[in-house]
Amino acid sequence: MGYSTISNDNDIKVCVIMVGLPARGKSFISQKIIRYLSWLSIKAKCFNVGNYRRDVSGNVPMDAEFFNFENTDNFKLRELAAQNAIKDIVNFFTKEDGSVAVFDATNSTRKRRKWLKDICEKNNIQPMFLESWSNDHELIINNAKDIGSTSPDYENSEPHVAEADFLERIRQYERFYEPLDPQKDKDMTFIKLVNIIEEVVINKIRTYLESRIVFYVMNIRPKPKYIWLSRHGESIYNVEKKIGGDSSLSERGFQYAKKLEQLVKESAGEINLTVWTSTLKRTQQTANYLPYKKLQWKALDELDAGVCDGMTYEEIEKEYPEDFKARDNDKYEYRYRGGESYRDVVIRLEPVIMELERQENVLIITHQAVLRCIYAYFMNVPQEESPWMSIPLHTLIKLEPRAYGTKVTKIKANIPAVSTYKEKGTSQVGELSQSSTKLHQLLNDSPLEDKF
């Protein structure tokens, strides 16, 4: 019997319509919502009106003057972009069986919002408005700098020029902006975030799926931060090619543990952070030399291999051949006898993800399957690909969430370690080919480099 999702059970279709001036974190929040829901197996997609605007505008300059509401020609182009986006959203629900769409734009006037609400309701889609309102000058400037360096509108501009132009764009929108109001908009379903979480206004949230979205956005913090991911150092079980267990580190694993602080400081300097580990010995030993506050999470323990715990893949293939084949055929859904599947791990990781979104700088030291699930969340990796990603030992992965994606930096410790990666169709471990997924390639490209 197959799994069902929240959206399958209730046939809910929700369109989250973003509201807010530029540089308030709307695109960041939009992308986070999509990644979160997709990670939970809910079919969701973001429709960024800026992309549609660039498509319909041709060679028209995207400077601040383009957003002058009194420029009728450019206003018509922006309206056309919005029309194309909402048309695609309707098709996403009616032809692709989507569950949640995010309409990512300023939607700064009540007239625009009513137009969107009417279209959604006409097509049996539940509109849910989400406003990010802020007068936090520091946050706005930081967001403007981030957008100036990452937005496609400014790909050929110097950072200081892009920032100045973007601030002028904000001023154009401020002239006509109408924020959501609990009285004037009392008949609408909406959530309003004031200065991120200083105040949260919730109005007419009716469904379970809407409440899940509300709970999630109340936990995210669109502020600059770093997240480091690392497997424990090489363990004795790794050397013996066994899975699971609670073995100690090998000699090389202890070498990695002693070098980990240096790797973190080289990537970010002197910085305050918290270290999260699982309850298993090998992660705690890896964190032992770090001078930071430490927190253990049972939810970060390795995927439970059930009856196969402590066995090699060769032994599993010999003793449980049908299970071995079934896991290769559907690694995300397959559950070890008496153990867990990758889907089970995702479910138990949800509280970890929520708390991770609330925190600032965190170093997570955990296990291969768990890191695959966490990395898949931040990088929006499809379910069928995530269990096949290679997360090598003795490698620190630095994630930097940004407005238009997550910046990834891979830092190798240059301390040898065995490979525990098993490709599909074999019981042997080790990097046998380059035929795996794009994320396999991403995490195995050599020299240190930054990627989006």
From Swiss-Prot:
Q: Give the UniProt keywords, A-Z.
A: ATP-binding, Hydrolase, Nucleotide-binding, Phosphoprotein
Give start-end of the signal peptide.
Answer: none
Which residues bind ATP per the record? 20-28, 143-148, 324-327, 368-372, 404
Q: How is its activity regulated?
A: Inhibited by fructose 6-P, activated by glycerol 3-P.
User: What is the similarity comment for this entry?
Assistant: In the C-terminal section; belongs to the phosphoglycerate mutase family.
Q: What does this protein do?
A: Monofunctional, high-specificity fructose-2,6-bisphosphatase, which releases phosphate from the 2-position of fructose 2,6-bisphosphate. Has no detectable 6-phosphofructo-2-kinase activity.
Record SMART domains: PGAM
Q: Quickly give the catalysed reaction.
A: beta-D-fructose 2,6-bisphosphate + H2O = beta-D-fructose 6-phosphate + phosphate
Instruction: Kindly give the InterPro entries that the UniProt entry links to this protein.
Output: 6Pfruct_kin (IPR003094), 6Phosfructo_kin (IPR013079), His_Pase_superF_clade-1 (IPR013078), His_PPase_superfam (IPR029033), P-loop_NTPase (IPR027417), PG/BPGM_mutase_AS (IPR001345)
Species, as recorded:
Saccharomyces cerevisiae (strain ATCC 204508 / S288c)
Q: What is this protein called?
A: Fructose-2,6-bisphosphatase
Specify whether Signal is a keyword of the entry.
no
Q: This protein's superkingdom?
A: Eukaryota
| Chain intervals for the UniProt region annotation (Fructose-2,6-bisphosphatase) | 224-452
UniProt-listed PANTHER family? 6-PHOSPHOFRUCTO 2-KINASE_FRUCTOSE 2,6-BISPHOSPHATASE LONG FORM (PTHR10606:SF44), 6-PHOSPHOFRUCTO-2-KINASE/FRUCTOSE-2,6-BISPHOSPHATASE (PTHR10606)
What transmembrane ranges does the database entry give?
Answer: none
